[in-house]
């Protein structure tokens, strides 16, 4: 599926009351918080640990690991929906944003500036 197709189809599910910058921006942050909250709860329960910059499942049952992974994927989808919505209310196509980001990253990589801080590097 193309990103712009996803954006259009996702926004077909958007209620009129949600089609505004404030809702999309604030709820994007909320959805990221829900994702991180689910990870934190599983860390507290010792079902997940973070090591080598990735999540490691420590469930004793495979079904529980798949269920947790499914919940996190669902939250990632909610984050993606909110990002698509934020771009839509700004009048931006997701594909354009993705291309701009890849161009910026390629430029930084060519100049040896991938690692660092600040927008203008």
Question: Where are these predicted regions, by residue range?
Answer:
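Flexible "arm" and connector segments at domain edges
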Residues: 1-76, 80-121
């Amino acid at each position: 599926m193309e990103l712009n197709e996803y954006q259009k189809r996702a926004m077909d599910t958007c209620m009129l009351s949600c089609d505004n910058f404030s809702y999309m921006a604030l709820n994007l942050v909320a959805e990221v918080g829900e994702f991180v909250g689910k990870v934190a709860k599983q860390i507290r329960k010792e079902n997940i640990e973070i090591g080598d910059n990735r999540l490691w499942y420590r469930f004793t049952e495979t079904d529980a690991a798949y269920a947790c992974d499914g919940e996190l994927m669902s939250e990632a989808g909610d984050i993606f929906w909110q990002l698509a919505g934020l771009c839509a209310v700004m009048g931006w196509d997701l594909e354009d944003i993705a291309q701009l980001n890849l161009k910026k990253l390629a430029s930084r990589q060519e100049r040896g500036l991938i690692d660092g801080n600040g927008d203008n590097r």
